[in-house]
Amino acid sequence: MANKLFLVCAALALCFILTNASVYRTVVEFDEDDASNPIGPIQKCQKEFQQDQHLRACQRWMRKQMWQGRGGGPSLDDEFDMEDDIENPQRRQLLQKCCSELRQEEPVCVCPTLRQAAKAVRFQGQQHQPEQVRKIYQAAKYLPNICKIQQVGVCPFQIPSIPSYY
């Protein structure tokens, strides 16, 4: 009798464990399905950027950062000197608008869309000098940190190296 009772309890415990594992696996599979996209998250971000031209204020801010340093202003080296943006109300407002645009992006899309925005700035209008291209991409790289987007911080993309022709 004790053996039968033990077997029944063991069978019930096994059923309980299998049911629990099955439910857990279903939840994990559901989360994975929800997070994935048939075209992939990076391609989705690029497609959205191209369709809607996201981050217009960020592109304008990057353009201003590219020209910063001429005429005695601060330049972008390894860190940003934000004094000009704080003292100049127009630049401060533009940066705030850019940060607002970035906060509307999905965290997974922040860096890919910033890279697309930097690329758009780089190829708009005139041909830029290597130092200007570096400033564009450096501005894009650090924008999530400047805007205090904690899920992102600093974008991990490399700043393209442009050969100097002079």
Curated annotation (Swiss-Prot):
Removed propeptide positions: 22-37, 73-88
Coiled coil: none
Keyword vocabulary terms for this entry: Disulfide bond, Seed storage protein, Signal, Storage protein
Alphabetized Pfam families for the sequence: Tryp_alpha_amyl
Listed GO MF terms: nutrient reservoir activity
Record bears the keyword Disulfide bond: yes
Signal peptide: 1-21
InterPro entries named among the record's database cross-references: Bifun_inhib/LTP/seed_sf, Bifunc_inhib/LTP/seed_store, Napin/2SS/CON
Hydrolase in keyword set: no
Function of the protein: This is a 2S seed storage protein.
Similarity comment: Belongs to the 2S seed storage albumins family.
Subunit composition and interactions: The mature protein consists of a small and a large chain linked by disulfide bonds.
Protein's UniProt name: 2S seed storage protein 4
Organism name: Arabidopsis thaliana
Source species taxonomy: Eukaryota, Viridiplantae, Streptophyta, Embryophyta, Tracheophyta
